[in-house]
């Protein structure tokens, strides 16, 4: 064994061994308990970033630990390979998205191997290959036949720069999240999957997910947004149709003083024919922010349509306004307004001088003061005719019942959740497998024409999708008739909604899933990824699992038992102000810093002499140029050091502050472990440990070893507090470094301790542990070694620390046998110099003894 720890030499050797032995390849084995550990698959952007490294290190630690418990562990990896960035990069680099993507995959695969992650590479998949997306296309056609897919014209957020539809969440401050271009409203035909048909199940089954973070479950509950209310129909004077609204507060219905409709509503369109002001307003709304978060904060605007609706209970005429806060695609495109008891309605009514009628009393029973704001709390009705005096629940039911009896109301359950629009007007995605015949009939692509292959050898102009620009690509024949293929491609959330299941049978040729393999491995035991995926990916992931279950492919109701959302990785951020006032962000690697005595940054400059402004720690990002390249760190310190720092610096679900000083500390620790093993093995063979022949000091050290095993086992397995597990191993290492090594049993005990330390560190730092296990002559490869088991007998304390007080003041701390009697403890306490001093010449009036903990002598 060489004296110095040289990660650059050992890591590549160990990685080669894993590759050659196919150490982490697994097959179904009914005789073993399975464990499926999965991290969210990466987008092949070109290089790994520290966020990836953190996510995948957490997954690898858990997978390796579970393997050491003797389980059949599946830990696969693949590539979420379709998506818009590839198109931008292709245009920029004058290539096509496919070669750019495949080059990135090859590069990033090497980076993952360099970090020592124990993946089953035989299951690797890339979602951009026809072998993968053919089954997604086939599944879509099956969903169409089940009436779970439909096409409709829909108002969308359109980015004129990217020429694509954006989801509401992708609109930030009215602009495209990717390129910051102002978003427009546009009506286009799109394909939808009926996720709303599963709304109740998606909501109710959240209660089964005991090991998912409450924050994620709450976000999904709110996103699905189940509400109980009443749908009410209004007659409108001089208008051919009625207006239907939905309300969750029928108790306030007597205070409804106006209706509001979306700018795209047929009533508003009709009114605009003779109203230029309204026509201009409708035009303005076409280019308005539509993400819900924006709706809450934007200025509320409207125009009177001139139409009057009739209140079904009072018979009063109330105005109908077109308003920018009503969306056609939410509910009926019309809402009833109760300005006395809804703040948005109140602000709108105040702005345009509309009637505000209070119908709910304040909590103290007085009429509410509406001079400044609406009263939004529930309460007792007044000003409401026959319903006066009813509380919220009674009024809800009475008004709902009356409207139902009149034939103008119906109790309804509503959802905020909308059907999933899966059409994208981009090229680099899976083609949607639908065709249109010459007679206008729309139908699924026949099975014998699947997959509909996306051509990869294309020229990108950065504007139009190559399959839209090439009329020949769309031409096909179905049943002998000419037909045109759909030229939209799937939303890339489609591919990431079922990849976890395909990992169980990536080579399967007979269908989407091999049920036998899928049901052996599924559900996933732990799924690891960022909380930013809470409402999109993680909802579609659950939805797809239920679709596959209902197609008979899987037996379970949910795709993953546990979800672990890792925290972000933060780093220092610096900038200097350029000549034109712009901020130029400087990498923390290039910042020369001065620190105060507490280690805080007080001054910074770069190599060119610019005075830098330090903005603190923020999420590693390209925009702030504060990302740290994992590859540079691995080359400098080794993969094991980077992995150890990642797991030690912070709890897995909290933010992690990148500090190179912390990385250096992790590296020093591994050097100490190496040195201790080197010094131990240099002394030659070791005798067998004789537990019965140990001295008190040796027993105490062995007790520490086994207590550490127990703590680390609990921290990794049950608590998943990996940082405290590492801290416990470090504490034990400090004790081992000071332990005597001269006697035969000293060395035998050290051998037992080091074999335990190396196994406990193995999930975190597998390369050094693989090597040290061999040097310690551990049995076989450490990858097949069992996790150490704490010896209960070794952990039994045979002595305990008792605090000795005289008149309540601590005078000594003494070690006594655990079974010592009170008399023996008093006798031992009397031998202490300070205790004897305070007892000299006085009478002990009272003795308070808490066995094994405290002796208090009261003297007078």
From Swiss-Prot:
Family classification: Belongs to the class-I aminoacyl-tRNA synthetase family.
Class of the enzyme per the UniProt entry, highest EC level: ligase
Motif ('KMSKS' region): 619-623
Compartment(s) of residence: Cytoplasm
Gene Ontology cellular-component annotations: cytosol
Keywords of the record: Aminoacyl-tRNA synthetase, ATP-binding, Cytoplasm, Ligase, Nucleotide-binding, Protein biosynthesis
Main location: cytoplasm
Motif 'HIGH' region: chain residues: 42-52
SUPFAM superfamilies: Anticodon-binding domain of a subclass of class I aminoacyl-tRNA synthetases (SSF47323), Nucleotidylyl transferase (SSF52374), ValRS/IleRS/LeuRS editing domain (SSF50677)
Species: Escherichia coli O17:K52:H18 (strain UMN026 / ExPEC)
MF terms in GO: aminoacyl-tRNA deacylase activity; ATP binding; leucine-tRNA ligase activity
Name under which the protein is recorded: Leucine--tRNA ligase
Residues given in the record as ATP binding sites: 622
Record EC number: 6.1.1.4
Catalyzed reactions: tRNA(Leu) + L-leucine + ATP = L-leucyl-tRNA(Leu) + AMP + diphosphate
Entry's Gene Ontology BP terms: leucyl-tRNA aminoacylation
Pfam families listed in its UniProt record: Anticodon_1, tRNA-synt_1, tRNA-synt_1_2, tRNA-synt_1g
